[in-house]
Amino acid sequence: MAITGTIAAIATAIVPQQGSVGIVRVSGSQAIAIAQTLFDAPGKQVWESHRILYGYIRHPQTRQIVDEALLLLMKAPRSYTREDVVEFHCHGGIIAVQQVLQLCLESGARLAQPGEFTLRAFLNGRLDLTQAESIADLVGARSPQAAQTALAGLQGKLAHPIRQLRANCLDILAEIEARIDFEEDLPPLDDEAIISDIENIAAEISQLLATKDKGELLRTGLKVAIVGRPNVGKSSLLNAWSQSDRAIVTDLPGTTRDVVESQLVVGGIPVQVLDTAGIRETSDQVEKIGVERSRQAANTADLVLLTIDAATGWTTGDQEIYEQVKHRPLILVMNKIDLVEKQLITSLEYPENITQIVHTAAAQKQGIDSLETAILEIVQTGKVQAADMDLAINQRQAAALTQAKMSLEQVQATITQQLPLDFWTIDLRGAIQALGEITGEEVTESVLDRIFSRFCIGK
């Protein structure tokens, strides 16, 4: 994949009438020339690398001032892309940054593709592919723990073990190929030692694969649906949990007509909480739509909080809803326990195969900590700490690791079957290639396109 031209893009979020600063980034061989054409730095300011200049951005023909700005100059290779890079730090909003970007394009730059700045950093050797993916994860992080995990990946915490595993495979391959080329000059291979080495590599791959589910939780979060009969306190539960009045709460059944969402973080995991309409038979057409959306939310959720009224106990309505959601991971929330005598709470009946039960008094904001603990237990993560999550692979990396492990298992089978040495090398090369795809040492252009299309244009 070739690097062509000088690229430019807006590097900050564009929000109308918001944001005090907007940045236009330019990278490539013509970046400094474009900056010198557009930027007027008064006085005796020196155009040196890694200095900030103050001045005015002017139209190159009319010399009309477009914006008062700062210019950051970074000469190759000491820049994000390892090319010459300039950044115009303009006033925020839409107009100024769009005008500056347009002047850059008219002066010889082209609009950057999504992720092209990071792609150039990868192609120029500043980042490997795991670090590039970690940048996207860091930008999109939805919790402090997710950001910390992404930062660990950016610092090479994943790349290092992958490179070591690949190097170990290359060492084994070199031993085998040496016997193929110089069989008469070298002692025979120790089959058992090679199998042992391969088993050790496969075991380390398995350890990396075990981080996939935790990584996905940190990246995509957990979707939790609160379901139950009308007026059991679902909206009160959402409000108490989110510490806000996200949902309307009344004593009238059917108040919630649509799905209400709230974004939370539980034990480092981003959680999307869905407060749904009470599920019941109704002739109200609007409420019917809400009930159907409740069922859809329950069927697509990662976890269902089946909420019941402890004051009325388990009803036929609760049983009907339970039959609809029992195939999903489920926590039974016994709400309104403040309305029930303490000695009666433990005698409340419910289906025997429900193993996770939480007692809450949502209107009094009681039981939320117990609910969060139960959620962390049911997703089998425990309290996620940043130190536990230094390694967390994504789906692409997991697929490559799985392929590498399968190839190594095939090498073991080939050795056990006492096939010729040439056969040993075939699957070993497959494992080496799969590991190389993770860091980018062996990767196709289509894979790069797919990875970097996730990025915003200015990154």
From Swiss-Prot:
The gene is mnmE. (6S)-5-formyl-5,6,7,8-tetrahydrofolate binds at R25, E87, R126, K459. It comes from Nostoc sp. (strain PCC 7120 / SAG 25.82 / UTEX 2576). Keywords: Cytoplasm, GTP-binding, Hydrolase, Magnesium, Metal-binding, Nucleotide-binding, Potassium, tRNA processing. It comes from the Bacteria. Homodimer. Heterotetramer of two MnmE and two MnmG subunits. Binds 1 potassium ion per subunit. This is tRNA modification GTPase MnmE. Coiled coil: none annotated. It is found in: Cytoplasm. Residues 221-380 form the TrmE-type G domain. GO terms for biological process: tRNA methylation; tRNA wobble uridine modification. Exhibits a very high intrinsic GTPase hydrolysis rate. Involved in the addition of a carboxymethylaminomethyl (cmnm) group at the wobble position (U34) of certain tRNAs, forming tRNA-cmnm(5)s(2)U34. SUPFAM superfamilies: P-loop containing nucleoside triphosphate hydrolases, TrmE connector domain.
